[in-house]
Amino acid sequence: MAAREETLPGLVLRNAQVRPDKPAIREKDLGIWRTYSWADYGRQVREFADGLAALGFGAGDKLVVIGDNRPRLYWAQVAAQGLGGAAVPVYQDSIAQEMAFVLADADTKVIVAEDQEQVDKVLSIQDQIPTLEYVVYDDDRGMLGYDDPILRRFEAVQELGRGKAGVFEKSVDALDPDAIALMSYTSGTTGNPKGVMLSHRNMVETAKTFCAGEDVRESDDFLSYLPMAWVGESMYSVAVSLVSGCSTNCPESPETLERDLRELGPTGFLASPRGWETILSQLQVKANDTTGVKRWFYDTFRNAAVNAELAKAEGKSSGLGGLMRLLGEFFVYGPVRDQIGLRRARWCYTGGAPLGHDTFRFFRAFGVNLKQLYGSTEVSGLVSVQGDANANPDTSGKPCPGIEVKIGDNSEILVKSPGVFKGYYKREDATREVFTDDGYFRTGDAGVLDEKSGELLIIDRAKDVGKMADGTAYAPQFIESKLKYSAYISEAVSFGDGRDFVSVMIAIDQSTVGNWAEKQGIPYTNYADLSQKPEVRELIAGEIARVNTTLPDAVRVKRFLLLAKDLDADDAEVTRTRKLRRAYIAERYAPVIDAFYGNQGEVNLRTEVTFEDGRRSHVEARLLIQDAA
């Protein structure tokens, strides 16, 4: 019999016993935050699990959750895990056909869907999921006329469970910590996604490592808004919460996230680089709209703090005296943190891609303890985290205690830890390929371990690192990340492997460039029109010229064009986590690549676009190619 502290549902029962009245999870609904205690959490999970058992769900079965971050979806996951099954979260913005592959591959038995939108997707593809027996829905709005026999209300399953009390606890106490708890599907940058099998031990031990290293406390609040299908969300909103007893908080909707963040003021916050850049961009827009004394205070103290952060990075005296820092905290830094909802934040993180130096240093300068972490789905989301005192934009910190890292052939990062996954579901050959003979997991990322500091520097995906025609090393993500540091650039795709020079396709950030265009008095009708304005091309040319000054001569961008649409996951150009699907992009945009290296000045491009409801259309545009300075 496993100790309850060794499994995720066991931790739910422990928390319900040792801290029954403490807040476990909150949900904002109709403008009001509703709090559920750990006793509530335990009861909800127990009743749903007993109901699942009555429906025939048991060990080895798979339960899929689809929707925004909601308490009931979290409870459903832990309930399934307590019965010996595995939870399989799916990206809620996936179109139906994209979702069909994962649901079928996972041998899904039960789906818990947030609302009518997700139920409709599932019903449209249910004939492609032969193992599916039940679809349980949370929000019943719009569901009155639905009579498909596989449908069940969430409450109805719980009611069924109330007559089967005791099943959940018995199953949890008999649970093997090495049983599969979570199947998190990879982003599928090179093909179909693979189901990464993570055990209770993987998740719990990784969460314990994180909680110990970051001093996560029972009193902490974490905002849960990132996609449930991302392993980081499962780690930091579920496993870390269950291990530490801290609270998970679900915003009302993606549209209210900014307001909900300010209201809650969490002590822990995780965002992608794009998320942090959006927050900074919004702050800059607001600052630009102020005048007089307010603007002077903001500019003065911002410049002082950022310069101090730069000096600190160079090992020099910051020059920001105690009085200046105190005044800045009172007039600028504190109010700004309060405005964005991070006044109480003790730990803030970014990961998944490099964050721009200016963005990173801005938040650090304003008193936000922003740090970079590194992990992947196959290692339960954690390998390294930066320390509070030495966080910098160039590394991903030191490997956490108990996690071994070494650099293999082709600079590939190799990892051995309690969080390393059990294998890919039904893919034994693929599993064998990603382990070395001595048991290290091949991350597929190229990196360097700094001999002096012991910190890990991520370079690029190992398979993407190539060479220019003259033999110069070429890392596309390194160039693309520098370009995306610009607030005006949403996405960048660089080409250069085996070529004489580097060229780049740019997708502009419509919001930021649109605001700039309005201030310049430049009219436009839509994204395609805005992107092809001569003034916008010159704006982006200036951003590229600035980046080129930081690059070695051989890999400086020589030619570029602006796309008439942003890259989209619905069009299979990027994954749901915004990773580039390079092979597909190279095929889809082959005419652009040919034009770059055929010395053409323009290209006529016709691309297919997919809408959220699955409908398809086409975008046709004449794109001008420009030489970069």
Predicted regions and their residues:
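Structural core segment of the AMP-binding/adenylate-forming
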Residues: 12-13, 55, 82-159, 539
